[in-house]
């Protein structure tokens, strides 16, 4: 009996050992593969952000869900008031709280001014022409356009792609002085086109410089925490998690920022019109409330029908062309019929008379 019990324990321990060995052999491989793919994805995202050539492109990469809303906020200054609206009306998940539209416009303008492009600059004529030291010009420098500005990738430089030559009239002076200064035409290179071009052989992957982080700042292995669209980075778990599992950073006190809609329960954001619009339209004879999208009143009234030279019918909430035999007075104290509509001859004179005495 003891022999059978001992043999059973040995077999059980051997089974546990095999299971543990399998897990230790295959488990880390799976985790390492996931970590490697995550790191590769983060590096690709970082390269895309580094290569962004405009504010709109950067926002499209960093906030791909809301980049059209960002574009609208940049173009329409009136949408800046969305930040001060209530939580249930025209609130955004990212933009409304953390960024200001005017600040984004300033950043965009600064970005555009620093792009690689021909810029007016001052060059020394003698250095440009390679003249000897016994010859100089007055004025010594001229204004021309040369390529300058920043590129969006490492390993490239702003260089000219097309050049023209402009003529400048200058005084050429030679020493020792043997004659009066001579007026001569001088041709100087003027850059008309610029582009960011590589300065040497390019590596298959761009070199990404990283700063050293102290353990107190971040204990996670990745210095960049870019996640897929439907996920967010969790500093405590050191991984990307679904948005439902963790609040947005800095929005713990603003739960309305995590709402799935941008404009409230009754409205949706129209990307073409760059504004919130009601989800369901009202019937043709009703007016829609701009805030809560409720339907109320008639589109037509006594005054509106009068301006159209028609008759207002409250029972159908519409303006009709059919003119009755008696004159009705509009809110402007002008008759709706008698001048603009045809009716029986025997009542026309009465209608015309009623215009003077409604």
Curated annotation (Swiss-Prot):
The keyword Disulfide bond applies. Gene3D superfamilies: Cystine-knot cytokines (2.10.90.10). Keywords: Angiogenesis, Cleavage on pair of basic residues, Developmental protein, Differentiation, Disulfide bond, Glycoprotein, Growth factor, Mitogen, Repeat, Secreted, Signal. Residues 1-21 form the signal peptide. Glycans are attached at residues 160, 190, 292. Highly expressed in fetal and adult lung. The keyword Disulfide bond applies. GO terms for cellular component: extracellular region; extracellular space; membrane. Undergoes a complex proteolytic maturation which generates a variety of processed secreted forms with increased activity toward VEGFR-3 and VEGFR-2. VEGF-D first form an antiparallel homodimer linked by disulfide bonds before secretion. The fully processed VEGF-D is composed mostly of two VEGF homology domains (VHDs) bound by non-covalent interactions. One of its GO terms (molecular function) is chemoattractant activity. Induction: By the transcription factor c-fos. Disulfide bonds join 116-158, 147-194, 151-196. Sequence repeats lie at residues 227-242, 263-278, 282-298, 306-323. It comes from the Eukaryota. Its main location: secreted. Residues 22-93, 211-358 form a propeptide. SMART domains: PDGF (SM00141). PROSITE patterns: PDGF_1, PDGF_2. GO terms for biological process: angiogenesis; dopaminergic neuron differentiation; fibroblast proliferation; induction of positive chemotaxis; positive regulation of cell division; positive regulation of cell population proliferation; positive regulation of mast cell chemotaxis; response to bacterium. Homodimer; non-covalent and antiparallel. Belongs to the PDGF/VEGF growth factor family. PANTHER family: VASCULAR ENDOTHELIAL GROWTH FACTOR, VASCULAR ENDOTHELIAL GROWTH FACTOR D. Growth factor active in angiogenesis, lymphangiogenesis and endothelial cell growth, stimulating their proliferation and migration and also has effects on the permeability of blood vessels. May function in the formation of the venous and lymphatic vascular systems during embryogenesis, and also in the maintenance of differentiated lymphatic endothelium in adults. Binds and activates VEGFR-3 (Flt4) receptor. This is Vascular endothelial growth factor D. The gene is Vegfd.
């Amino acid at each position: 009996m003891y022999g059978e019990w001992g043999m059973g324990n040995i077999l059980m321990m051997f089974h546990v050992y095999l299971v543990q060995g399998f897990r230790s052999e295959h488990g880390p491989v799976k985790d390492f593969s996931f970590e490697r793919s995550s790191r590769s994805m983060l590096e690709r995202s970082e390269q895309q952000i580094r290569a962004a050539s405009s504010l709109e492109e950067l926002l499209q990469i960093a906030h791909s869900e809301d980049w059209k809303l960002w574009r609208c906020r940049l173009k329409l200054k009136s949408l800046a008031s969305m930040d001060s609206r209530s939580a249930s009306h025209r609130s955004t998940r990212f933009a409304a709280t953390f960024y200001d539209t005017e600040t984004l416009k300033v950043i965009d303008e600064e970005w555009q001014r620093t792009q690689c492009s021909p810029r007016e600059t001052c060059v020394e004529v003698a250095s440009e022409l390679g003249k000897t030291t016994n010859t100089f010009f007055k004025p010594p420098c001229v204004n021309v356009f040369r390529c300058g500005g920043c590129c969006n990738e490492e390993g490239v430089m702003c260089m000219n792609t097309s050049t023209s030559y402009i003529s400048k009239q200058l005084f050429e002076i030679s020493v020792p002085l043997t004659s009066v200064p001579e007026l001569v035409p001088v041709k100087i290179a003027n850059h008309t086109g610029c582009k960011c071009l590589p300065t040497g052989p390019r590596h298959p992957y761009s070199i990404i410089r990283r700063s050293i982080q102290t353990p107190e700042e971040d204990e996670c292995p990745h210095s960049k925490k870019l996640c897929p669209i439907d996920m967010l980075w969790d500093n405590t778990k050191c991984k990307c998690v679904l948005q439902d599992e963790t609040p947005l950073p800095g929005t713990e006190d603003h739960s309305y920022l995590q709402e799935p809609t941008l404009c409230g329960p009754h409205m949706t954001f129209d990307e073409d019109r760059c504004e919130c619009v009601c989800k369901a339209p009202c019937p043709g004879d009703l007016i829609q409330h701009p805030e809560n999208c409720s339907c109320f009143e008639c589109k037509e009234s006594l005054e509106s029908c009068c301006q159209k030279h028609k008759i207002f019918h409250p029972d159908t909430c519409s303006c009709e062309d059919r003119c009755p035999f008696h004159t009705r007075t509009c809110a402007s104290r002008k008759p709706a019929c008698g001048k603009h509509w045809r009716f029986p001859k025997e009542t026309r004179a009465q209608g015309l008379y009623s215009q003077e005495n409604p």
